């Protein structure tokens, strides 16, 4: 990448686009129905990173980069062309997703379709799929509610898996006092952004409602049943990543426990062996 080669000094992105290099960094994705608070999600992720050195060390040891900030999305939800109020509504319903999050709907009976944000609007318009996993800031930016008028608050959770990195060559040139400032500013930035994301969430929901979307919040009973339909997947996915040489099961367990310490109650408590 441009960062690894030192072409740019600092850059950002999503670990979701690097599943082979950074599979462990999707640990919150493996345990859906986590906190819907971006700020809590960030704090949970930082606690996990703090005791899992493999998460940050890989950037410096293998990719010539330094982690500066972790960034959090608003809660993952579904924009759909029909209401989703029961598990029956999901059966054979075609739903697009980025890939790592498709098991959230496939295990519940839907048909998962690999997609990207850039083609979501046209794919909904032409019927390639009838719903798409996303988040309300994306809904607003891409006007997805024009094609999928039912915005379903599933409660999949706010995920912390975006980043800001600095090229290590650039980092090493900085005096120690400047390095400390960069680290402090990086941590401040991620907290401010998470807080802003949290505050903007309801504003954006209100916006799409004004523009004709119906915002549906699924019942606690449906959320519990949906989470139970995924009960085996977190452990299966962790074991797959374990085999790649990462401490995935340990990290997934830790994520569950840390979320609980931050006050989260899982609708179904996943078991990681």
PLM feature spans:
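Core domains of carbohydrate- and sulfate-ester-processing enzymes
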Residues: 49-51
